Curated annotation (Swiss-Prot):
One of its GO terms (cellular component) is extracellular space. The keyword Secreted applies. Belongs to the NPY family. Pfam families: Hormone_3. This is Pro-neuropeptide Y. It comes from the Eukaryota. NPY is implicated in the control of feeding and in secretion of gonadotrophin-release hormone. It is found in: Secreted; Cytoplasmic vesicle, Secretory vesicle, Neuronal dense core vesicle. InterPro entries: Pancreatic_hormone-like (IPR001955), Pancreatic_hormone-like_CS (IPR020392). GO terms for molecular function: neuropeptide hormone activity; neuropeptide Y receptor binding.
Length: 97
């Protein structure tokens, strides 16, 4: 009975933590502006196109600060193309004798 209760409590905790994580990811990007419709006045269409342009600029902008996260720093170190790290063949070195 005690083990069954622990199992259900751990499943409930896992489900709640997953819901919290999904809620966090949902707010990552701004929401797309609502289309006022085909027969909307010119001012509403101008506001919509301005909001849409702002939305597209936010979504497609370059994020310069994202490269400094620890994961990307490690991948840069591991996958960096550096001539010193590339192994050379013995035939490129001058003969020793």
């Amino acid at each position: 009975m005690q083990g069954n209760m622990r199992l259900w409590m751990s499943v409930l905790t896992l489900c709640l933590s997953m819901l919290i994580c999904l809620g966090t990811f949902a707010e990552a990007y701004p929401s797309k502006p609502d289309n006022p419709g085909e027969d909307a006045p010119a001012e509403d269409m101008a506001k919509y196109y301005s909001a849409l342009r702002h939305y597209i600029n936010l979504i497609t902008r370059q994020r310069y600060g994202k490269r400094s996260s620890p994961e990307t720093m490690l991948s840069d170190v591991w996958w960096r193309e550096n001539t010193e790290n590339i192994p050379r063949s013995r035939f490129e070195d001058p003969p020793m004798w």
